[in-house]
């Protein structure tokens, strides 16, 4: 019996395909998101990562296949970025209050949790990249989600702030007791806490623990041998592993498939 056979999935994708104008964007995607897990999606630009998130968020219908949601799943979403009209200044508090059913205390609590209470009355247009991402994260947790979906959460954040932001995301996950699904190229920063990595290029090319994926030939062809070695080094020095459900377990890999794509 698997360690977490009693945990019910938050979301399951079964044989999901997405096509536009007879062009395949996603092919035969199968994945399961469990409570309290952290799953990171990597892959080349144009490989379908953002499309996969849109399907999960019900922003785009799958051409075929099934997307099954737990009846109690509550999703918070952090996009890569948002467009704000500079001619219409708006404070952080006003921006967050645009979410239906939000109360001032909810806003204060979210900002306090993310250590940005001092930004409450600041203009959104004057925020730095890191501050903006924290505000978007605050907006995502207003509905107290049990699944946070993050699309390149360090977009627009300088290098020194990226590790700090990922640490804040991890702390938020622990506070909310939620799962995280994120698209990220910063695997060297998130790998210690990631339970499963999915490498997506139209289909799932390889998947498993960060250490397992870093040794997969497909991953190495995508990201380079030195980058893969760095990931393997970091994971080797992490003092334990987690399975995809978030539990400490003995060394084991999950799944790895041979990618049909050729990479020049």
UniProtKB/Swiss-Prot annotation:
Chain sites annotated for binding ATP: 43-50
UniProt-listed Pfam families: ABC_tran
Keywords: ATP-binding, Cell inner membrane, Cell membrane, Ion transport, Membrane, Nucleotide-binding, Translocase, Transport, Zinc, Zinc transport
UniProt-listed GO biological process terms: response to zinc ion
Reaction equation(s) it catalyzes: Zn(2+)(out) + ATP(in) + H2O(in) = Zn(2+)(in) + ADP(in) + phosphate(in) + H(+)(in)
Membrane topology category: Peripheral membrane protein
Molecular function via GO: ABC-type zinc transporter activity; ATP binding; ATP hydrolysis activity
Residue ranges constituting the ABC transporter domain according to the UniProt record: 11-226
Source species, domain of life: Bacteria
Subcellular location: Cell inner membrane
Major localisation: membrane
EC number of this enzyme: 7.2.2.20
Cellular component GO terms, alphabetical: plasma membrane
Family: Belongs to the ABC transporter superfamily. Zinc importer (TC 3.A.1.15.5) family.
Oligomeric and partner information: The complex is composed of two ATP-binding proteins (ZnuC), two transmembrane proteins (ZnuB) and a solute-binding protein (ZnuA).
Biological role stated in the UniProt entry: Part of the ABC transporter complex ZnuABC involved in zinc import. Responsible for energy coupling to the transport system.
Protein name: Zinc import ATP-binding protein ZnuC
Species per Swiss-Prot/TrEMBL record: Histophilus somni (strain 129Pt)
